[in-house]
């Protein structure tokens, strides 16, 4: 793969690294901050992802997408202040709501999907073959 294409494909990962570094800077310098397991999980997944990038580039890209997906649904935190939105549909007294969605992570995830569409398409085809064998 060309170096320019690799840098473009790495852009969401670099945004993720910068955001988590800034988040941990805020967590460690602000007095009233409370570090939860979701912050530790995000940091550990990022460190594992860095190692995977050195081992296999395409797998690192897939793991970056998984981290962004987890962050979008607030299962891990990559920002200091976590603001989420949730929408719902109401049928009489029944309320059906979406999971909490983190806007910044969703924006980076959309950019990731646009830049890495070919990798996602290839991963989807491999996953379909694996599931077909089962």
Model-found features: residue ranges?
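Aromatic-anchored segments of alpha-helical transmembrane domains
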Residues: 15-25, 68-80
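Membrane-helix interface/capping segments
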Residues: 56-73, 80-88
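N-terminal signal-anchor transmembrane alpha-helix
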Residues: 1-43
